[in-house]
């Protein structure tokens, strides 16, 4: 393993300039092995090493892990810094999940520490198995085509370079190294929780791939590196092409010439859309997957002016004659729509939320749409409206507030008021399409109701 890592560092010239390296250390096997390895080879690599531990304060073992890392550094004479990161408080404010919030806080703190101490590098313990997981997860989610690959070997953040020296080795090699140098790392039990997507990939898919080819991580590494190089080249071309079709650009509005855009090759068109979204979402786009880019492409090709598409976080794409506009909604609070609409029975009904199609069933449900539910004749007339304070859904046991349903499903605040609630004639909520159906509906097979949302953002949550 040692020579593999040294060869990887030399091949990618990770520490060519030398200087202080801040190693992100959780106390787990990956980061502890990286800390030990870099400190042991510091003279050969021409670097100085400092350990940085971010205490997320989420588990009882958190303080014990911080003490463990600190004591390890004291016993080896390694520089050490730590901080208590307010993950829970930030989650309550942002509504983001624990992993996303912890990662954002951790990296911001590491970057601040690097600036404070004049560090040239931040090193993390990501390894070859992590690379396989990341690439496969991106492919499954539909975000791989326009990404720059998997986990980058290096990434610039201001004046600091984030580097991953272990991307060329496996988790098994790291575990073996820990035993070899007598490191007994701490283990985070959440790494075994099947509720996290990455863990399901790690414990189910990675062993299968390893069984097929023990060196698969090397091939995935090349895939990521080649993809990054290819994508950088294509994005440069797309930037030049975008400059030629751009009519207006500021933080609230981007306008392009439709005809000029359509004269560009399709691969560059997709990347031009990607660049616009990246700009408007300030590099952190929730709308750069297959579904959003393809829907924007369809809108641009549509011959009907006035067509609109709603994206997450208040961005609207619209065709206005010969122009395509990306518009960011103002920060002003919009009135909550109520829109009570009655559905009497079979047929199609258009609402401000989208279209509802009701058909009578003869031989079981027909639609596979997640926005479909069934009901009986006694449920009609149905009423469709937006949420109101106090609305509740019925569960198998007890009830739940609709507001809590949206929180549990991680639906953004601005989208919640655009989501229809469907009531039966007894004023019970029979469906929040895509998120909830009344427990009794599975026994009611007289009619099938399919909702087609007008706002495509709803599809991101089902």
Curated annotation (Swiss-Prot):
Q: Which UniProt keywords apply?
A: ATP-binding, Cytoplasm, Ligase, Nucleotide-binding, tRNA processing
State the EC number(s). Answer: 6.3.4.19
Cellular component annotations (GO), alphabetically ordered: cytoplasm
Primary subcellular site in the record, as a coarse category: cytoplasm
Any coiled-coil regions, as ranges: none
Query: GO molecular function: any one?
Result: tRNA(Ile)-lysidine synthase activity
Which residues are ATP-binding? 26-31
Q: Which cysteines are joined by disulfide bonds?
A: none
What reactions does this protein catalyze?
cytidine(34) in tRNA(Ile2) + L-lysine + ATP = lysidine(34) in tRNA(Ile2) + AMP + diphosphate + H(+)
Q: Does the keyword DNA repair apply?
A: no
Q: Which GO terms describe its biological process?
A: tRNA modification
Recorded hits in Pfam families, A to Z, give:
ATP_bind_3, TilS, TilS_C
Report the domain of life of the source organism.
Bacteria
Location in the cell: Cytoplasm
Top enzyme class: ligase
Note what the entry says on domains: The N-terminal region contains the highly conserved SGGXDS motif, predicted to be a P-loop motif involved in ATP binding.
The family assignment reads: Belongs to the tRNA(Ile)-lysidine synthase family.
- Family annotation (PANTHER family): TRNA(ILE)-LYSIDINE SYNTHASE-RELATED
What task does this protein carry out?
A: Ligates lysine onto the cytidine present at position 34 of the AUA codon-specific tRNA(Ile) that contains the anticodon CAU, in an ATP-dependent manner. Cytidine is converted to lysidine, thus changing the amino acid specificity of the tRNA from methionine to isoleucine.
**What is the name attached to this protein's record?**
tRNA(Ile)-lysidine synthase
Q: Which organism is it from?
A: Halalkalibacterium halodurans (strain ATCC BAA-125 / DSM 18197 / FERM 7344 / JCM 9153 / C-125) (Bacillus halodurans)
